[in-house]
A protein has these predicted regions:
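A short core secondary-structure module
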Residues: 132-167
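Glycine-rich flavin
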Residues: 29-137
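Glycine-rich phosphate/cofactor-binding loops in nucleotide/flavin-utilizing enzymes
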Residues: 2-12, 311-354
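A generic N-terminal leader/anchor concept
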Residues: 1-50
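C-terminal helix-coil-helix/basic helical segment that borders enzyme active sites and/or dimer interfaces
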Residues: 27-30, 260-293, 303-315
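A generic local secondary-structure boundary/capping motif
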Residues: 112-115, 129-133, 142-147, 171-177
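Generic structural signal for well-ordered, non-transmembrane alpha-helical segments
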Residues: 220, 252-259, 288, 292-299, ...
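Glycine-rich beta->alpha junctions and the first turn(s) of the following alpha-helix
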Residues: 174-259
């Protein structure tokens, strides 16, 4: 299942012929599924030439993310934060760093990471940061930390190979994204370079753009599931078992769903590159719409494919089972009704397009 179509690029806004350049990358990703060091090397190679959002090729960036995730959801989960870290640094005017990078911006109860001034006027990080994916295998990360007093949080560039960095043992029992454990990291006076001042990390347009890039990854994983379903129907038809009306209706539903989600991403990419924020809608509201639209599409596709294919491939097909489990965890980065409530609150205050 999926052997003939899973490395096809995902089309968002390019012409199909333009996507052919992605094929060697997708083949390399497929050859190294489950091999995290190799996938990090691939991410580093991609990062040298990948476009930044907001510079005229946002749609191509999202096609890259979606296409890699369609081959392997975990590979997309590795690639996206590396590219996001490079984009964050570039947006602040910093040079592109060497090595594999991540972004650690989560907060957790009972865990606090503080940035303190050192004797030379720079910063050192002290404390703990939760949800640090692959920290032990990365070279560096963009990390948010609390500034002294009531200044809020700022983003810092940090060398994760510093001896003051201690990666905790992840209590990772997940069946999805098993090769990408997230766990706590302890920082003991680790030197850190401030990227920009307090509030910049969350207030910059790139924060919303990055959130939509994650949605492109989700959609890529769901499109791979849809391709699995379509292939299964085609194989059955070749054996004389034509799809019934329910299966065809569900495939049609999936087709419409993918088209709508793709159109939402394409429209957002076009706006980002044209620097045309709507007069009545903030950048973050736009991101909430896109992420919500794509997350709903992903969950719809997951439900329809699972109902039609039944338990067989979940139990006996490694690639399909892995994709399903990986995507189910990844899409939970969307906060469902809480994100919709945030969007609704903004809409009520006039931050809407209708």
């Amino acid at each position: 299942m999926g052997e003939t179509t899973e490395f096809q690029p995902v089309l968002i806004s390019s012409e199909p012929v333009q996507l052919q350049a992605l094929q060697p990358t997708l083949d390399a990703v497929h050859a190294h599924i489950g091999d995290v060091p190799a996938l990090l090397d691939i991410a580093k190679d991609i990062g040298r030439t990948a476009p930044h959002p907001g510079e005229g090729s946002t749609g191509k960036l999202w096609e890259l993310l979606a296409s890699v995730t369609a081959v392997d959801v975990a590979a997309g989960r590795i690639l996206e934060p590396h590219l996001d870290a490079l984009h964050i640094l570039a947006q602040a005017g910093h040079d592109q760093p060497a090595g594999a990078w991540g972004v650690f911006a989560a907060e957790g109860p009972g865990q606090k990471l503080e940035a303190k001034k050192d004797d030379d006027g720079g910063y050192v990080l002290e404390g703990d940061k939760p949800w640090c994916s692959l920290a032990a295998q990365l070279d560096g990360a963009v990390i948010t930390a609390h500034l002294p007093g009531e200044e809020g949080r700022a983003a810092f560039a940090v060398d994760l190979k510093d001896p003051g960095v201690t990666c905790g043992e992840p209590a990772w029992t997940s069946r999805g994204l098993r090769e990408i454990p997230s766990g706590p990291v302890h920082f003991n006076r680790v030197p850190a370079t401030i990227i920009e001042g307090p509030g910049w990390y969350h207030q910059r347009p790139g924060f919303a753009w990055g959130g939509m890039g994650v949605a492109a990854c989700w959609l890529g994983g769901a499109i791979a599931l849809a391709r699995d379903f379509a292939e299964s129907l085609a194989r059955s038809a070749d054996k004389g078992r034509a799809a019934d009306q329910i299966a065809l209706a569900h495939l049609g539903d999936i087709d419409r769903t993918i088209n709508s989600a793709t159109a939402s991403l394409a429209r957002a990419a076009e706006r980002i590159d044209a620097f045309e924020p709507d007069a009545f809608s903030s950048t973050w509201s736009g991101a909430l719409r896109v992420r919500g639209t794509v997350a709903a599409a992903v969950e719809r596709i997951q439900t329809l494919v699972s109902q039609n294919l039944g338990p067989g491939p979940l139990a006996f097909n490694e690639a399909y089972g892995k994709r399903t489990a990986d995507l189910s965890l990844y899409v939970r980065q969307h906060h469902a009704m809480r994100d919709d409530a945030q969007l609704g609150s903004r809409a009520l205050q006039g931050d809407r397009e209708w």
